[in-house]
UniProtKB/Swiss-Prot annotation:
Species for this entry: Xanthomonas campestris pv. campestris (strain ATCC 33913 / DSM 3586 / NCPPB 528 / LMG 568 / P 25)
InterPro entries per record: Glucans_biosynth_gluTrFase_H, Glyco_trans_2-like, Glycosyltr_2/OpgH_subfam, Nucleotide-diphossugar_trans
Protein name: Glucans biosynthesis glucosyltransferase H
The keyword Glycosyltransferase is annotated on this UniProt entry: yes
GO biological-process terms attached to the record: glucan biosynthetic process
Gene name linked to the record: opgH
CDD domains on file: Glucan_BSP_MdoH
Region listing for Disordered, in residue ranges: 1-28
Gene Ontology CC annotation, any one: plasma membrane
Length: 645
């Protein structure tokens, strides 16, 4: 398994492309690779222990699982001391079951975050010989950069690709790279615009014979089918392919180091970077990118620490060994009707699992900077995307039991499924926590005491319930605290995020806004789960990339029902008891104010005002990399051009 691919000659004799209508070629000669459909019912794990696995990987996973189980066992023992006195009701049994699952969930995240914090502070975790501080290595193979697109603004899309192209050219190793725009666009006017902008790009940078464009007539299997079609037609020319998203930007330095990492490690099938979220303008986008910049490394370094050579694939900003992908990542069509049947939606997890089954190592390198993406501008846009991810992740229930998968690959899928089931579980936990005192000891009509869940739980077993609440909140918020401490210990990052005080204020504001949005997210994720289980498909629409521009009628349609429901529940709770209303206030308030919160956080001027105040700052704003500056320049220039779509 040396990953060797027979190379065809580089297409150097293609004529300039000034107009697609003139019939000039936009693609290189084909070099097909067979990409057979993989079976989920047959297969075996080819290599159990990878050469590139870090030392002590078994102990790392023992720490994660053992720490999770130990913390959960202690929490359950304390919870039993609260519930057991006076008998054990059905509601209390439901509460305990929900508590066990949810506490184990956050305890595992906490244990992983602690490992990530230590790795970040110790500046450890570098692997595969990829050293961002070393001289730039020389390359010996060819790599294709693939940018799939679906009904995107072509000027904006190709501005990002041009910035990447120029950055790669600055490394002096452009001859080792070809660039492909892989269009699945279904709207004819956008397709025609893509062709025009592609021709302009080739003329602008002299990219004839190195930048290519292909539009599928049938966009079967969505993005996964788009990439698979390229592999089957052109993959034989390229030992590696680097997958980009429509909003991806990467530096040439990072791309060259990724390719060198693949060349130096012939048993590695995939290397995933940690894309930093950038270019946020709205308040929501800026709080998201700040959180990703401060907390994201703690989480990413943590999972990379215990993933080892069984890391996951996020679908973009990753380099893949083409032959390994062709041999093992051909996705089957799942039996049954949508939403569980049909083409695999969240294809990246499954492709990674199948490649690992085939004996290839999968790695994440979160320390390698120079990889960027953009986030949704509004909560509404995030939830639209999240609904699609929800369906894709729940669909993995049909894949997780496939023959021969590594147990860590199965764990990736189970975590993805569990992420969406936790939303309705948190809601049920809250309702059961109120229902227990409401059904029993919390009401004492003889003494005329008002109903008070807080008084009931505080009086249970010497206040152990309060300790459970405090510990749960600490475990939930610990990644934020650890991220802030790591920031303080890095003077350069600290200054780039506005300094210690502004960073602390940013974390506080982000936590408050996230808490206000949490009931909305919980409700809509829960609804998404039930819609998927009821058979409702999510569809496939182009993503919003710039500011959200949400109208008040659209906000009222999206969140008006939730606000009315919050008012109804708040009024009902107050009629039962003001104490009950106070207990439910964090959830009720989030529902009631959902419209103004989403509206304010969707505003560009609010986000930019906070930027001027030094709130939600990230290093890429204080000292932006050249590739991001260039991409922004090109996109601003494109915005001045007459619209093509």
């Amino acid at each position: 398994m040396d990953g060797t691919v027979t190379l065809s000659p580089a297409p150097t004799d293609l004529p300039p492309v000034s107009s697609l209508d003139a019939g000039q070629p936009t693609l290189p000669p084909e070099a097909p690779l067979a990409m057979p459909e993989q079976s989920l019912r047959e297969g075996s794990l080819q290599v159990r222990h990878q050469r590139t696995s870090p030392m002590g990987i078994g102990l790392r996973r023992f720490y994660l699982i053992g720490g999770t189980l130990t913390a959960t066992a202690v929490a359950v023992w304390v919870m039993l001391s609260v519930l057991w006195p006076g008998g054990f009701s059905v509601l209390e049994g439901c509460l305990l079951g929900l508590f066990v699952l949810l506490f184990a969930w956050i305890a595992m995240s906490f244990a992983s975050a602690v490992a990530g914090f230590i790795t970040v502070v110790a500046r450890a975790g570098r692997k595969l010989g990829i050293d961002p501080d070393a001289p730039l290595p020389s390359l010996h193979t060819r790599t294709a950069l693939l940018m799939p697109t679906y009904n995107e603004d072509p000027r904006r899309l190709l501005a990002g690709l041009q910035a990447i192209y120029e950055s790669v050219a600055e490394t002096g190793q452009l001859e080792h790279f070809d660039f492909f725009v892989l269009s699945d666009t279904t709207r004819e006017h956008i397709g025609r615009a893509e062709e025009q902008v592609y021709a302009e790009l080739c003329d602008s940078v002299g990219g004839h014979g190195r930048i290519f464009y292909r539009r599928r007539a049938d966009n079967a299997a969505r993005k996964a089918g788009n990439v698979a079609d390229w592999v089957r037609r052109f993959g034989g020319n390229y030992p590696q392919m680097l997958i980009l998203d429509a909003d991806s930007v990467m530096t040439g330095d990072t791309i060259v180091r990724l390719v060198a990492g693949m060349e130096d490690n012939p048993d590695v099938g995939l290397i995933q970077t940690l894309p930093a979220v950038v270019n946020g303008q709205t308040l929501f986008a800026r709080m998201q990118q700040f959180g990703g910049r401060v907390y994201g490394p703690i989480i990413a370094f943590g999972v990379a620490w215990w993933h080892g050579a069984e890391s996951n694939y996020w679908g973009h900003n990753a380099i893949i060994r083409t032959q390994a992908f062709a041999d093992h990542a051909g996705l089957p069509s799942l039996r049954g009707r949508k939403p569980f049947g049909g083409h695999v939606l969240s294809h990246d997890f499954v492709e990674a699992a199948l490649m690992r089954r085939g004996g290839w190592a999968m790695h994440m390198v979160p320390y390698l900077q120079g990889s960027y993406e953009e986030g949704p501008p509004t909560l509404t846009d995030l939830l639209v995307r999240d609904r699609r991810w929800c369906q894709g992740n729940l669909q993995h229930a049909k894949v997780v039991g496939a023959k021969g998968l590594h147990w860590i690959s199965r764990m990736h899928m189970m975590i993805g499924i569990g992420h969406y089931f936790t939303a309705p579980m948190w809601g049920m936990l809250m309702l059961v926590g109120i229902g227990i005192p409401l059904a029993g000891a919390g009401i004492d009509l003889a003494q005329g005491l008002p109903f008070s869940p807080a008084r009931y739980w505080h009086g249970s077993s010497d206040g152990n319930a309060i300790w459970i609440f405090v510990c749960t909140m600490f475990v939930l918020l610990a990644p934020k605290l650890l991220g802030y401490i790591a920031l303080l210990l890095n003077p350069r990052e600290r200054r780039a995020c506005g300094g210690a005080i502004r960073a602390a204020l940013s974390i506080l504001l982000e936590t408050v806004l996230a808490a206000l949005m949490a009931p909305v997210v919980m409700y809509l994720q829960s609804r998404g789960v039930f819609e998927v289980l009821a058979g409702k498909d999510s569809g496939w629409d182009a993503q919003v990339r710039d500011d959200g521009k949400l109208s008040w009628p659209a906000l009222i349609r999206s969140y008006g029902g939730l606000s009315v429901f919050g008012l109804f529940m708040g009024t009902l709770a107050y009629l039962v008891s003001p104490s009950l209303a106070a207990w439910m206030a964090p959830v009720i308030v989030g529902m009631v104010v959902s419209i103004p919160v989403v509206a304010v956080t969707s505003l560009r001027r609010t986000g930019l005002a906070l930027r001027r105040a030094g709130i939600f700052c990230i290093p890429e704003e204080l000292d932006p990399p050249k590739v991001l500056v260039r991409a922004s320049e090109l996109r601003r220039a494109a915005a001045l051009e007459p619209s093509l779509i």
